[in-house]
């Protein structure tokens, strides 16, 4: 955990050194709503939380946050969106990062993830959509939706 925190701080410092912070690029993200593929598992669909997403350019953004996951445990995440394609105004790509807090996945510890994503962004409101693949008996798959807001 300490190593991950150091990595995030180092990345943030490098970003700050590269470009000046622009508040217009910062999104505040709510938790998630997850439509699970396995509806009979008693999973929590509403996953409240808070996160932040900083749009570095039209293709890249950095993200981190905390939410109550589908197993009713607290989870943290950190990652980077790479969305090089746009179709009908929707950004398409992946988010690569790490999650923790899932009791059946790596004993609740941190694990890597690569998740297909689509994002729709307006002037103030946006929506991230993710296709979370199932991971055997460790993580249940879902289509997840994350509402976001930008103060401009």
Region spans (language model):
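Transmembrane beta-barrel strands of outer-membrane/channel proteins
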Residues: 30-34, 64-66, 94-98, 129-133
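Solvent-exposed loop/turn segments connecting transmembrane beta-strands
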Residues: 37-45, 67-76, 86, 100-111, ...
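Residues on the lipid-exposed face of transmembrane beta-strands in outer-membrane beta-barrel proteins
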Residues: 30, 50-54, 64, 78-83, ...
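Cleavable N-terminal export/targeting peptides
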Residues: 1-23
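Repeated loop/turn-to-beta-strand initiation elements of outer-membrane beta-barrel proteins
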Residues: 26, 58-62, 88-90, 120-129
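Outer-membrane beta-barrel proteins
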Residues: 15, 19-20, 56-58, 81-87, ...
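Short glycine/proline- and aromatic-enriched beta-strand/turn motifs that initiate or cap beta-hairpins
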Residues: 18-66, 76
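Outer-membrane beta-barrel "beta-signal"
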Residues: 27, 32-35, 140-152
């Amino acid at each position: 955990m300490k190593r991950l925190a150091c990595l995030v701080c180092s990345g943030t410092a490098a970003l700050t050194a590269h470009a000046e912070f622009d508040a217009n690029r910062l999104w505040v993200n709510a938790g998630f709503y997850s439509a699970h593929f396995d509806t009979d598992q008693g999973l929590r669909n509403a996953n409240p939380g808070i996160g932040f997403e900083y749009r570095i350019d039209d293709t890249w953004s950095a993200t981190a946050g905390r939410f109550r996951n589908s197993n009713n445990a607290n989870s943290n995440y950190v990652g980077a969106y790479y969305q090089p394609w746009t179709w009908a105004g929707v950004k398409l790509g992946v988010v690569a990062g790490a999650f923790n807090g899932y009791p059946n996945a790596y004993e609740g510890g941190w694990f890597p993830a690569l998740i297909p994503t689509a994002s729709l962004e307006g002037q103030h409101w946006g929506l991230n959509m993710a296709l979370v693949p199932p991971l055997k008996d460790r993580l249940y798959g879902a289509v997840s939706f994350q509402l976001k807001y930008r103060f401009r």
